């Protein structure tokens, strides 16, 4: 039988991890399912890794460069381009941080243009390269 170091009681997180968890509730108005599972499981199995990953997240999400609204708009667009379901949670967080429907829609417009023009840009570059090689022989 494998023994492991003593862990905190289930759902009892150290204060630093509880503070990180509470930031999700501030942003989203709730603790989303994926972070909730991460806090429960990683908090039990490897709280050090959870703390490291949450410090990395906090460093990126909360800065003196972008305010919370802009950060959430950027994350919404990035996740939208990736077709990631978490885009919805970041749209909610952006609204809670003061984003207008127009701002969110503009981000969706930018994401759709980025996604649809990428094949046109790449295709044109490939075809130009092929044409240039053909004309040089």
Predicted regions span which residues?
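Short alpha-helical "patches" and their helix-cap loops
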Residues: 87-100, 126-137
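Substrate/cofactor-recognition hotspot
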Residues: 117
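Amphipathic, charged-and-aliphatic alpha-helical interface segments
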Residues: 70-85
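N-terminal alpha-helical segment
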Residues: 53, 70-71, 87, 104
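Helix N-cap / loop-to-helix initiation motif
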Residues: 66-67, 98-102
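Acidic, glycine/proline-rich low-complexity segments that act as flexible tails and inter-domain linkers
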Residues: 1-70, 122-137
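Acidic-glycine-rich active-site phosphate/pyrophosphate-binding loop
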Residues: 45-55, 85-97
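Beta-strand segments within the central parallel beta-sheet cores of soluble alpha/beta enzyme folds
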Residues: 105-109
């Amino acid at each position: 039988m494998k023994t492991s170091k003593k862990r905190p009681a289930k759902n009892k997180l150290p204060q630093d991890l509880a503070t990180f968890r509470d930031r999700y509730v501030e942003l989203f108005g709730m603790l989303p399912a994926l972070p909730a599972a991460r806090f429960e499981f990683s908090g039990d199995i490897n709280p050090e890794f959870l703390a490291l990953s949450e410090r990395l997240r906090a460093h990126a999400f909360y800065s003196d460069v972008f305010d919370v609204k802009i950060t959430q708009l950027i994350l919404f667009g990035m996740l939208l381009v990736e077709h990631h379901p978490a885009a919805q949670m970041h749209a909610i967080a952006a609204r809670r941080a003061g984003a207008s429907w127009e701002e969110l829609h503009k981000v969706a417009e930018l994401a759709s243009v980025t996604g649809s023009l990428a094949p046109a840009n790449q295709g044109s570059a490939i075809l130009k390269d092929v044409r240039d090689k053909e004309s040089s022989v």
